[in-house]
């Protein structure tokens, strides 16, 4: 569907092509998932022939997407100024680890690094050991934000004919998911710690073991809590100060989880 997309890799193939190999030739599951309906080619953009191919592609393209640090883009002639000299209407979307300015601009990084630096790992698992989420949500969220920004840039180009630079970074994306915690800490000086699956700002919100497996219950807001107290036969909890609102229920979540566990 949609655009014609050409993925360009190094001559030997990029590393991500072979992560979690599932095919006879070693191609990885995520590579196959993310490259459906895409075209592909390999080249070396630092060689004359590779540069000629890149130039021809840029001349007829609307968008270039790259996940390389700024110095690397410049060394390959893929920086925005050079691309714009070839095609004034080009849109360059770059997704780096830490952005294109600042002390970390030239560093590379992975999903897990952003999870760690954003504080997300400190709020995952238990308080004894920071825990990384298995699913690379920062990678996927960064790509989604990049796609959103790119489409807005493309809509603007259709109106004005002008291209522009779109930038996302893994750390910015990860911080987007933890900003509420950082804001709370800055304003209220609240320093939260991981509490496994139990939420800290509402309840019941936790995982519970039943006779035939585990379930997750997530309750936010007074109406749902009232329904839960009716289910538990604990209507008197509605007048208990410990459970008067979401935050109070989160702070006393261990009591709510204990009651829910008994019911399960």
Name these PLM-found stretches:
Residues 115, 164-167, 218:
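Glutamine-centric residue-chemistry signal
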Residues 136-151, 170-178, 220, 224:
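Mid-domain beta-loop-alpha active-site segment that forms a flexible
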Residues 100, 127-135, 158-174, 193-200, ...:
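Conserved Rossmann-fold dehydrogenase catalytic segment
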Residues 30-32, 166, 206:
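Residue-level detector of beta-strand structural context in well-folded domains
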Residues 1-162, 193:
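N-terminal helix-loop segment corresponding to the beta1-alpha1 unit
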Residues 204-264:
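Aromatic-enriched alpha-helical interface/lid elements that frame and gate functional surfaces
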Residues 143-164, 176-188, 229-236:
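Oxidoreductase and adenylate-handling cofactor-binding alpha/beta cores
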Residues 12, 97-99, 170-175, 212-214, ...:
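Glycine-rich beta-alpha junction loops
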């Amino acid at each position: 569907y949609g655009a014609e997309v050409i993925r360009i890799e190094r001559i030997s193939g990029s590393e991500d092509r072979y992560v979690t190999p599932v095919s006879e030739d070693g191609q990885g599951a995520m590579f196959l998932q993310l490259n459906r309906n895409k075209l592909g080619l390999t080249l070396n953009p630092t060689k004359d022939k590779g540069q000629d191919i890149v130039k021809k592609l840029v001349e007829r393209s609307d968008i270039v997407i790259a996940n390389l640090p700024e110095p690397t883009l410049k060394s390959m002639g893929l920086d925005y100024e050079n691309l714009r000299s070839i095609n004034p209407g080009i849109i360059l979307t770059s997704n780096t680890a830490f952005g294109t300015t600042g002390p970390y601009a030239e560093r590379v990084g992975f999903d897990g690094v952003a999870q760690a630096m954003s504080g997300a790992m400190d709020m995952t698992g238990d308080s004894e050991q920071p825990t990384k989420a298995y699913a690379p949500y920062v990678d996927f969220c960064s790509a989604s934000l990049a796609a959103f920004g790119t489409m807005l840039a493309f809509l603007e180009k259709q109106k004005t004919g002008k291209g522009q630079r779109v930038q996302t970074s893994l750390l910015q994306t990860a911080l987007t998911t933890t900003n509420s915690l950082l804001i709370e800490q800055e304003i209220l000086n609240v320093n939260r710690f991981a509490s496994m699956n139990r939420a800290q700002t509402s309840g019941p919100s936790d995982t519970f073991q039943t006779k035939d497996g585990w379930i997750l219950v997530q309750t936010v807001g007074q109406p749902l809590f009232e329904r839960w107290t009716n289910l538990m036969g604990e209507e008197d909890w509605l007048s208990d100060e410990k459970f008067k609102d979401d935050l109070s229920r989160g702070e006393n979540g261990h009591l709510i989880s204990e009651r829910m566990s008994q019911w399960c």
